């Protein structure tokens, strides 16, 4: 959530920065915001006047009583002022609620230096690593490579519908090995603390990280059974960023606790609303997929460097898996709702002859912290909002796709990256 004082000081500038994200979408009803602010100021001014008048009358009552004179008229006026103050307080509460709703619908402001553009075509490539392997045969995609190894979309569809998969045998083992390998890299080499988190969370948790209220259509939700008064709607997480980041909600942290670095492997559930017709074949876009997530909680001074480090932590996994990739800076129109700056890592897929996203690393600055009310105490004893960062380290299913396609041989076998072999009992190749 944005700082409302920023809008009060420079509404025109904030609106201009918001419009760079996906113009001409009107993120803020400026007319409504301005009207609410004007009414709020008028009520606050009137409240101060009434309070001053009440204080003056209270003194008069004391003086009248000391003289033995009648106080009924003055006390009646004080009572009327009390009614007016109560009505003002109630109206201010309504106004604040409406202002809060407007703020909750606003995305984060892009950092200075983020490329301005409407969509992915304006993203900027930063660097590449690795050379795509030259194949002397026509590459197969992961669907054809995975079928004899236990990658089964038919059973997934039979059980749950489109965009679900069923893994068995060698490919299921590879999937598990990848997740364990990623966790080990992040915990043993980069200092993250491994966590196991709930996959079902409450509404306020999703509001804290910014998925709600704007993106409810992208979520899966469940209703807990029981009596009517016990029935509760909760949500399946779309990423463990949600639970990891909210683990510090409504806390004041000590400065020496920061940065906090957390990681978790979890399934992720997404309805993929608006993705009809996109990536309908294979594992690239699923309703349920696994991901190893990285989260950092930092001070404002630490967050820019933390983002660069986090990108490096995701890159390390790809490099150890010997997978060619590139790093992209997302433009203003392609960034996620809560991000101030985002890097995407895209892995090379031979069958598609292109790079596809496998990790997204973002600095959300104080945007989520303000929603979660998470602060830290400075050396001067002042409470300041933390900064939050999140990144994929990596998407497990897409890593499996990349290992299958980049490791394929003419006979259909898959060469396992050397770093992954200890997690597969020393196995060097997957063979049907």
Swiss-Prot record:
UniProt subcellular location: Cytoplasm
Alphabetical list of CDD domains matching this protein: SerRS_core
MF annotations from Gene Ontology: ATP binding; serine-tRNA ligase activity
Binding site for ATP: 270-272, 357-360
Protein keywords: Aminoacyl-tRNA synthetase, ATP-binding, Cytoplasm, Ligase, Nucleotide-binding, Protein biosynthesis
EC number: 6.1.1.11
Reactions catalysed, as given in the entry: tRNA(Ser) + L-serine + ATP = L-seryl-tRNA(Ser) + AMP + diphosphate + H(+); tRNA(Sec) + L-serine + ATP = L-seryl-tRNA(Sec) + AMP + diphosphate + H(+)
Annotated binding of L-serine, by residue: 239-241, 293, 392
Entry GO CC: cytoplasm
Alphabetical list of Gene3D superfamilies matching this protein: Bira Bifunctional Protein, Domain 2, Serine-tRNA synthetase, tRNA binding domain
Pfam families noted in UniProt: Seryl_tRNA_N, tRNA-synt_2b
Pathway: Aminoacyl-tRNA biosynthesis; selenocysteinyl-tRNA(Sec) biosynthesis; L-seryl-tRNA(Sec) from L-serine and tRNA(Sec): step 1/1
Highest taxon of source: Bacteria
Entry's Gene Ontology BP terms: selenocysteine biosynthetic process; seryl-tRNA aminoacylation
UniProt keyword annotation of Protease present: no
HAMAP family listed in its UniProt record: Ser_tRNA_synth_type1 (MF_00176)
Free-text note on domains in this protein's UniProt record: Consists of two distinct domains, a catalytic core and a N-terminal extension that is involved in tRNA binding.
Subunit organization: Homodimer. The tRNA molecule binds across the dimer.
Record family assignment: Belongs to the class-II aminoacyl-tRNA synthetase family. Type-1 seryl-tRNA synthetase subfamily.
Function: Catalyzes the attachment of serine to tRNA(Ser). Is also able to aminoacylate tRNA(Sec) with serine, to form the misacylated tRNA L-seryl-tRNA(Sec), which will be further converted into selenocysteinyl-tRNA(Sec).
PANTHER family linked: SERINE--TRNA LIGASE, SERYL-TRNA SYNTHETASE
Protein name (Swiss-Prot/TrEMBL): Serine--tRNA ligase
């Amino acid at each position: 959530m944005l700082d409302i004082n920023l809008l009060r000081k420079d509404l025109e500038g904030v609106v201009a920065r918001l419009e760079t994200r996906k113009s001409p979408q009107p993120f803020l009803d400026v007319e409504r915001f301005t009207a609410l602010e004007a009414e709020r100021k008028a009520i606050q001014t009137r409240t101060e006047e009434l309070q001053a008048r009440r204080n003056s009358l209270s003194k008069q009552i004391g003086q009248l009583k000391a003289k033995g004179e009648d106080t009924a008229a003055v006390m009646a006026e004080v009572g009327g002022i009390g009614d007016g103050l109560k009505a003002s307080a109630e109206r201010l509460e309504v106004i604040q609620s409406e202002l809060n709703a407007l703020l909750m619908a606003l995305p984060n402001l892009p950092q200075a230096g983020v490329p301005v553009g409407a969509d992915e075509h304006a993203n900027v490539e930063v660097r590449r690593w690795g050379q795509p392997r030259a194949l002397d045969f026509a590459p197969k995609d992961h669907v054809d490579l995975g079928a004899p190894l236990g990658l089964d979309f038919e059973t997934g569809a039979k059980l749950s519908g489109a965009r679900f998969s069923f893994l068995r045998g060698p490919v299921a083992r590879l999937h598990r090995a990848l997740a364990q390998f990623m966790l080990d890299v992040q915990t043993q080499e980069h200092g993250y603390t491994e966590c196991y988190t709930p996959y079902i969370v409450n509404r306020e948790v999703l509001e804290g990280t910014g998925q709600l209220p704007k993106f409810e259509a992208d979520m899966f939700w469940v209703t807990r059974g029981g009596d009517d008064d016990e029935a509760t709607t909760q949500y399946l997480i779309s990423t463990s960023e949600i639970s990891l980041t909210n683990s510090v909600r409504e806390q004041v942290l000590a400065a020496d606790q920061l940065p906090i670095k957390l990681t978790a492997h979890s399934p992720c559930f997404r309805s993929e609303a608006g993705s009809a017709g996109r990536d309908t074949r294979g594992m690239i876009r699923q309703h349920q997929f696994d991901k190893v997530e990285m989260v950092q909680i930092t001070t404002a001074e630490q967050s820019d460097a933390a983002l660069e480090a986090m990108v490096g932590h995701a890159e390390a996994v790809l490099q150890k898996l010997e997978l060619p990739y590139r790093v992209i800076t997302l433009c203003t129109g392609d960034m996620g709702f809560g991000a101030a700056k985002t890097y995407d890592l895209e892995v090379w897929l031979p069958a598609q002859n292109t790079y596809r996203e496998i990790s997204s690393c973002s600095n959300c600055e104080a945007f989520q912290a303000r929603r979660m009310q998470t602060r830290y105490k400075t050396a001067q004893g002042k409470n300041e909002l933390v900064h939050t960062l999140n990144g994929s380290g990596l998407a497990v299913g897409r890593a499996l796709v990349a290992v299958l396609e980049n490791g394929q041989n003419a006979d259909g076998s898959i060469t396992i990256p050397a770093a992954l072999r200890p997690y597969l009992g020393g196995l060097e190749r997957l063979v049907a």
